[in-house]
């Protein structure tokens, strides 16, 4: 795996004076590129290879709790601001703790560069803002997280960016939704809240045919189970608050640049990356940043101007979670599949919505793209009415009722009245959310305790 220059605020920036690639000054990510290391090793070591210059050769990634950085002299400061020297300028743009986190997630996803921001919502917003503007069009999946759905259908729509929401796994629907001004196809690896699998190859083929950027939210999938870039995605986003952090303790988001879209060849369609940027003296990001143009522009322009910066401390906490991602996800999946088996046979359950079940419409895609399993976040329908669903939830002891997922602790929520309550009846029906829908996020507790807790709650209704 080739991982080079993930950290600096402009990745692989070329000097206008000599055209030579400027290497980052304090973290090298090339040592491990001589050998293909396994996921479990990469999640521990990327960004801290031998030869890196982290504080006092610390084994743990240090927390660089600083707002600004000292320039060596006036020329050094001018070169940093003029993008002739790739390094730290100000804490809103870069930080060495954050740099390790960014490089590690990018490595695990197989991307060329990463950018960490304050939340998953910020990551998605910045990703879309980077290439769409008034008059453009977005095609999005009909099974998105409610916040992403509202961003696309309301917030961006109010800014003159139109949208079409479709079943992206249906080729006819997807192709019919494409317009001349379509800039993005946006989908999730496993849809929220039912973990419906995405047909990566189908969507990728349509995106490539029409020269459209394919963006995937891989929060529910995790790079341990699937790497969307390998299936044709151009950009991957994460809410790092979820599986990456894993403990519900810190907010964060990550954007990973696949480096596989030709911005120069599509400059008229994507002028922010392929044409001169007036806010940087006419610099063309596809030229100065090469394959990492996408995240480089977000860092240099959007993050500079709007400032949804992740804190060094949060980056450190999320790094601690990242180091055990593979171990936790294995346990999440193992437990989830056992819970699915328990629920599908329970007399008080009307239906279980999980792609591992042969009856699920996405089972074929699940078998194709998730050979190691997946979907520890899913829903089921309880028999009865909404009050029965609420009573079931209120009688759980181990499961925490809260608006988060992918914690090591098992979680529960009632989507109809909480996370998806702002959707219309039609939109709720499209996502198969009813008053008796219950969403579970299966944690890493002992499986017998999880099932006993569910059984106890069922006994109370």
Predicted regions and their residues:
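Conserved N-terminal alpha-helix of the aminotransferase class I/II PLP-enzyme fold
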Residues: 73-122, 147-155
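Short, Lys/Arg-enriched N-terminal segments with co-localized hydrophobic residues
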Residues: 18-31
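PLP-dependent enzyme catalytic core of the Aspartate aminotransferase-like
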Residues: 112, 153-154, 162, 180-183, ...
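Conserved small-domain helix->loop->beta segment predominantly found in fold-type I
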Residues: 306-309, 313-315, 320, 324, ...
């Amino acid at each position: 795996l080739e991982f080079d220059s993930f950290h600096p605020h402009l990745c692989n920036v070329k000097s206008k004076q000599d055209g030579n690639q400027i290497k980052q000054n304090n973290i090298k990510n090339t040592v491990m590129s001589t050998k293909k290391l396994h996921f479990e090793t990469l999640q521990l070591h990327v960004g801290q290879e031998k030869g890196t210059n982290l504080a006092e050769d610390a084994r743990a990634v240090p927390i660089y709790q600083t707002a600004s950085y000292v320039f060596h002299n006036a020329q050094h400061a001018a070169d940093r601001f003029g993008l002739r020297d790739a390094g730290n300028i100000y804490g809103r743009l870069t930080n060495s703790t954050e740099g390790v986190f960014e490089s590690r997630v990018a490595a695990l996803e197989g991307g060329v560069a990463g950018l960490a921001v304050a939340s998953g919502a910020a990551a998605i917003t910045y990703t879309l803002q980077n290439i769409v503007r008034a008059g453009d069009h977005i095609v999005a999946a009909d099974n998105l997280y409610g916040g992403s759905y509202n961003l696309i259908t309301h917030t961006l729509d109010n800014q003159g960016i139109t949208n079409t929401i479709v079943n992206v796994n249906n080729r006819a629907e997807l192709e019919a939704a494409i317009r001349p001004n379509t800039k993005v196809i946006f989908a999730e690896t496993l849809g929220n809240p039912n973990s419906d699998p995405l047909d990566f190859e189908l969507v990728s083929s349509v995106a490539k045919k029409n020269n459209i950027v394919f963006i995937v939210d891989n929060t529910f999938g995790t790079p341990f189970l699937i790497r969307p870039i390998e299936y044709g995605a151009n950009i991957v986003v994460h809410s790092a608050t979820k599986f990456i952090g894993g403990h519900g303790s810190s907010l964060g988001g990550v954007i990973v640049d696949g480096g596989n879209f030709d911005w120069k060849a599509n400059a008229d369609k994507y002028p922010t990356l392929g044409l001169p940027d007036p806010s940087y003296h006419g610099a063309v990001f596809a030229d100065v940043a090469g394959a990492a143009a996408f995240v480089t522009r977000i860092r240099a322009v959007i993050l500079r101007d709007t400032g949804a910066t992740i804190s060094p401390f949060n980056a450190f906490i999320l790094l601690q979670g990242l180091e055990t991602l593979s171990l936790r996800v294995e346990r999440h999946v193992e437990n989830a599949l056992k819970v699915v088996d328990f629920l599908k046979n329970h007399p008080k359950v009307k239906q279980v919505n999980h792609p591992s079940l042969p009856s699920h419409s996405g089972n074929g895609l699940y078998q194709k793209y998730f050979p190691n399993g997946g979907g520890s976040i899913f829903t089921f329908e309880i028999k009865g009415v909404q009050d029965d669903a609420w009573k079931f939830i209120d009688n759980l002891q181990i499961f925490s009722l809260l608006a988060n997922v992918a914690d090591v602790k098992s979680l529960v929520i009632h989507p109809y009245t909480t996370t998806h309550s702002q959707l219309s009846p039609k939109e709720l029906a499209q996502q198969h959310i009813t008053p008796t829908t219950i969403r579970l996020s299966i944690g890493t507790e002992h499986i017998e305790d999880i099932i006993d807790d569910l059984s106890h709650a069922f006994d109370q209704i």
